[in-house]
C-alpha cells in the first residue's frame, strides 16, 4: 500500500505542531 495517507498525516501533524508551538 502506498503510504500516501501517512505522508499527508505527517505533514499535517507537523504543521499543527508548528502553529501550536508558534515557531513557524
UniProtKB/Swiss-Prot annotation:
The keyword Disulfide bond applies. Keywords: Amphibian defense peptide, Antibiotic, Antimicrobial, Disulfide bond, Secreted. GO terms for cellular component: extracellular region. Pfam families: Antimicrobial_1. It is found in: Secreted. It comes from the Eukaryota. One of its GO terms (biological process) is defense response to bacterium. Expressed by the skin glands. Disulfide bonds join 18-24. Antimicrobial peptide active against E.coli (MIC=8 uM), K.pneumoniae (MIC=14 uM), B.cereus (MIC=12 uM) and S.aureus (MIC=17 uM). Has very little hemolytic activity. Belongs to the frog skin active peptide (FSAP) family. Brevinin subfamily. This is Brevinin-Eu.
Amino acid at each position: 500500500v502506498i503510504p500516501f495517507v501517512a505522508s499527508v498525516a505527517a505533514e499535517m501533524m507537523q504543521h499543527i505542531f508548528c502553529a501550536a508551538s508558534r515557531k513557524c
